[in-house]
Structures are given as structure tokens and as C-alpha cells.
Amino acid sequence: MRLVLGVFLASLPGVLFAQDASRAVPGGGVSVPGWTGKIDANEERAGRTLNDAKFFKDGDTLHVTTGPAVAYWNPANKAGGDYTVKATFTEPKYMNLNNHPHPYGIFIGGNDLGTANQSYLYCAAYGDGRFIVRGFGPAAFRMNGFAGESNDAVHKAAGVGQPVTQEIALSVKGGKLECSINGTVVASYDKSALVTDGKLKSTDGVYGLRFAHNTEVNVTGFGMSKK
């Protein structure tokens, strides 16, 4: 029985690695005007703060280094009805701050952000070809399983320390919500499956950026368009 359990766990991406603890990033904090953020509740319970991750802008590029898992947003960035939010994420040195792949991506439908009742949905990519669709409502929820899914559209880094880039988009179109990565729709859900108790209050709301712990990513082309 123990052997069977061990084989099962070893088959799950990321389970082979011990969970690396979040670290404090020197010179951390949010220095992009108008923006703020919130780290995950479990990070707060462990004594981490928003200043343990670093978020700054250089030219047209947003630079993020975590630290604790975190969401960043500008309260002025709101979207409603049908829309698409997209950005390009570059991990300059894959897995340089962690011992296994960590994801990064976009969130939409942000309501009551920064409070204990916040809700939002995010789609995030890993540099190993996987993606996840998850959210908070306010408890964490998963839309595509424990470890996410692999998809050929998601770029894979050539190796540890090598760069990998993903273009990620979340779209609301009528009664559907779609996540696209590198131009391919990788997940599609009925809005009714997301706007419900324990998940989103609405797909209307603030949009922003989401990062796992101990990750270094550069973001370009972040914005929203109406369809």
C-alpha cells in the first residue's frame, strides 16, 4: 500500500520536491504609482508581508520578484461586460528562485480586493508546459485539478536558468470565460460555473497580476481591450 501511494505521489508534478519556504526579497515593496497588492492568507499567517515581495517598473516593463505568493493591481483598472485582459510574462532565468516550477499570470473579476472577502479568478502558466486556473472566493478554489494541466501551447524552458516567455489572456465573451496562452485557448468555462457561491461575485471588477512565491518575472504589454 505504501509503495502504491508513493508511486501515485511521484506521478504528480511538483510533488517530488519539498515545498520551498517563501523568502523575503531585499528592497521589497510596491513602488509602481497607483498600484497595491495582497499576499495570500497563508503567507500572512506565516508572518510575511507585502514588503517581502518586490514590484517596480522600468520603462514599459513591470518587474516582479517574490517572496510570498501575491496579487498586484491598480484599483483604477476595472473591466465589465465582454473584455480581454492580456500580458506577456518572461521568466529570465527559469526556476532561479525555487526548486520546482512556479506559475504567474493574470487575474480578473477582482472584488473586495485587499480584504478577507476578496474574490478573483486567475490563469497562470508554468515554464514546464503546464497551466492552472484558480481563484479565491474568498477560500481558494481550483478549476482544473490539483496540479493543473499540460498543453502544447504553453512554452517550456530549455532548462533551469534559461528564459521562457508566455503570452496570457483572460477573456469574457457573453456567457463564457476563456484563458488563452500563446494564442491558443487552453481553458473555457461557462460563466455560471464561476459566478456562484464560493467563487466569483462577478466577472466585472478589477484586473491585475498574480504570482506564486519565490518567482522572478518581467511583464510587458499588460492591458485590457473591449470586444
Predicted regions and their residues:
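Extracellular beta-strand elements of beta-rich domains used
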Residues: A87, T220-M224
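Beta-strand-rich interaction surfaces with strong enrichment in secreted/lumenal proteins
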Residues: A71-N77, D152-V160, G208-L209
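Secretory/extracellular carbohydrate-interaction modules
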Residues: T66-M143
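Bacterial N-terminal signal peptides
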Residues: V4-V15
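Low-complexity, Ser/Thr/Pro/Gly-rich disordered linker/stalk regions
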Residues: Q19-N96, K176
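Short, aromatic/His-centered strand-loop micro-motif at the edge of beta-sheets
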Residues: F141-E167
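Flexible glycan-contacting loops in extracellular carbohydrate-active proteins
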Residues: Y189-G221
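Carbohydrate-binding surfaces in secreted/extracellular proteins
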Residues: A87, V160-L194
